[in-house]
Curated annotation (Swiss-Prot):
Protein name: Phosphatidylserine decarboxylase proenzyme
Membrane topology of this protein: Peripheral membrane protein
Binding note for cofactor: Binds 1 pyruvoyl group covalently per subunit.
Pyruvic acid (Ser): residues bearing it: S254
Subcellular location: Cell membrane
A UniProt-annotated Pfam family: PS_Dcarbxylase
PANTHER family: PHOSPHATIDYLSERINE DECARBOXYLASE (PTHR10067), PHOSPHATIDYLSERINE DECARBOXYLASE PROENZYME, MITOCHONDRIAL (PTHR10067:SF6)
Assembly information from the UniProt record: Heterodimer of a large membrane-associated beta subunit and a small pyruvoyl-containing alpha subunit.
Biased composition (Basic and acidic residues): 308-322
Organism placement in taxonomy: Bacteria, Pseudomonadati, Pseudomonadota, Gammaproteobacteria, Enterobacterales
Length: 322
């Protein structure tokens, strides 16, 4: 009965306006009130502030600053084995396994379309048919920055407008095609392990989705699909990210879906639905053996990457002033 009521609310509540209101409130500097809200949040969700670069809740000017707080480097060591891909986010694995032609497992007994997830881009979908997927859910208590599982060269980004259903076990079991319906940002990379997609999925109260190369992707929510492309390799304007490097973040939010090409990686055997994930821990292993490369891709420069988009670059956390 209670679950039925919760599901009904998903269709009745004005999710877009709730999300806009949450985003507005989370970005406001309210002094003691901001600190009170953060303290209550930390207590309720049992957030481990000892991992944060700034453990004192009074050091955050807005709730958003707290929510995307950077962690101390040593608390998330990155597996350095060149054959290992690492977890991109702190959270819990919702589902993982093989992509069956066009079908991805959403929950037990419920599948959704790979092509629909990729906004009908059948050429991109062809890269991942019969490949491997991992869906990672980020709870409110988790660190909400998303990192690279491996070295990658950004080739394409697609913003897909959509619904803002909550993402949790209940909705995954009961809202058909949940991840293919919600707002999302699709990022396609060239990697040593073949093409890889890393998809940031929005949800109710997700104030924004951002990337390190383009800043805020949403809002604004204009209701149209947007697409950006970047050159390959070391060409001018290319964007290279290193294994373990931050690639994006949620301001309140949600879910990361990784897609890997067929025959390229094997997921770590111990992983299963509801496995806890920590950035930098092993996620998958290459089906081929790599030696440590003599050189790595040049990391993303500190200055804004020049690309044709309307987004703003992210602020360097280490340069933030309290």
């Amino acid at each position: 009965m209670l679950n039925s009521f919760k599901l009904s609310l998903q269709y009745i509540l004005p999710k877009l306006w709730l999300t806009r209101l949450a985003g507005w409130g989370a970005s406001k500097r309210a002094g003691w009130l901001t600190k009170l809200v953060i303290d209550l949040f930390v207590k309720y969700y049992k957030v481990d502030m000892k991992e944060a670069q700034k453990p004192d809740t009074a050091s955050y000017r807005t709730f958003n600053e707290f929510f995307v707080r950077p962690l101390r480097d040593e608390v998330r060591p990155i597996d350095t084995d060149p054959n290992v891909l690492v977890m991109p986010a702190d959270g819990v694995i919702s589902q993982l396994g093989k992509i069956e032609e066009d079908k991805i497992l959403q929950a037990k007994g419920h599948n959704y379309s790979l092509e629909a997830l990729l906004a009908g881009n059948y050429l991109m979908a062809d890269l991942f048919r019969n490949g491997t997927f991992v869906t990672t859910y980020l709870s409110p208590r988790d660190y909400h920055r998303v990192h690279m599982p491996c070295n990658g060269i950004l080739r394409e980004m697609i913003y897909v407008p959509g619904d803002l259903f909550s993402v949790n076990h209940l909705t995954a079991q009961n809202v058909p095609n949940l991840f293919a319906r919600n707002e999302r940002v699709i990022c396609l990379f060239d990697t040593e392990f073949g093409p890889m997609a890393q998809i940031l999925v929005g949800a109710t109260i997700v104030g924004s989705i951002e990337t390190v190369w383009a800043g805020t992707i949403t809002p604004p929510r204009e209701g149209i699909i947007k697409r950006w492309t970047w050159p390959a390799g070391e060409n001018d304007g290319s964007v290279a990210l290193l294994k373990g490097q931050e690639m994006g973040r949620f301001k309140l939010g949600s879910t990361v879906i990784n897609l890997f090409a067929p025959g390229k990686v094997n997921l770590v055997e111990q992983l299963e639905s509801l496995s806890v994930t920590k950035i930098g821990q092993p996620l998958a292993v290459s089906t081929e053996t790599f030696v440590t490369p003599d050189s790595e891709p040049a990391p993303l420069p500190a200055e804004e990457i020049e690309a044709e988009h309307d987004a703003s670059p992210l602020v360097d956390d280490k340069k933030d002033q309290v």
